[in-house]
Amino acid sequence: PNSNQRRRGRQTYTRYQTLELEKEFKFNRYLTRRRRIELSHTLYLTERQIKIWFQNRRMKEKKEVQAIRELNEIEKTKLGGFLGSARSPSSTTSASCHGTGSSLSPPLMEMGGHSSAE
């Protein structure tokens, strides 16, 4: 392969670049082309580097959320044997309906029956 076809090495980002990218991700998980161009000029990165950073960051978030859900399911299974008889039918229905949502609260919060909103 000629020099144009060689694979590029892994990009390392400065703390400042990472901080700015994380701040942007917090507000926008997806960037418009215009915003990507602005960031590339501000952070001295290419548009492609920014695009790939955001793709990787979204995948990291997806994996983290999935891991938390799996841990919550394990905890629900463990606690189900001890607290299964203490659950009312409405709390079981509520937990199963909300299990696919974005809430990442521990399962004990769902079983308490009281919330700060009440």
From Swiss-Prot:
Chain coiled-coil ranges: none
Disulfide links within the chain: none
DNA-binding region: 6-65
Positions of the UniProt region annotated as Disordered: 81-118
Keywords in alphabetical order: Developmental protein, DNA-binding, Homeobox, Nucleus
Classification via Gene3D superfamilies: Homeodomain-like (1.10.10.60)
Biased composition (Low complexity): 85-96
GO terms of biological process kind: anterior/posterior pattern specification
Protein name (database record): Homeobox protein LOX2
Gene: LOX2
